[in-house]
């Protein structure tokens, strides 16, 4: 009889976990968070494409430096959420992760670069007061490696060195 109980219990735990995951997947705060990340990514990608077209990778550095914080600020004001970028290997010390963010980033396995087709890792946690925390990975694509890769063109390295003297966001 004990053997039968042991076979049933894992199935019950799996069903309970799946039910919880389903409830979380439909949480309005999670859905809103995903939408904000999507909006941020689309706006930043559009600005980067424009910068690359107008002035190449050196101009794109200014997009990440100036436009990305503006986009995050606009989304923050509109939504009431705190929208920002962070990394364990940040370029700007102002973007250093808070302790909880650093822990989530370590759980994600960052700062590894992943460009496979699986869904990027995300984190969602809801507090008792109704607030929530959400993080999602920004994938490092081939165009990103011009400024974040192992080998940078001299003019790109010089611009990054001038704009970010404490840069830690290379070598992906």
Spans of model-derived segments:
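Bacterial N-terminal signal peptides that target proteins for export
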Residues: 1-12
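Intrinsic disorder/low-complexity signature
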Residues: 3, 23-24
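Exposed boundary/loop context
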Residues: 12-13, 49
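Extracytoplasmic c-type cytochrome modules immediately beyond a signal peptide or single-pass transmembrane anchor
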Residues: 24-143, 155-172
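Detector for the c-type heme attachment site
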Residues: 145-152
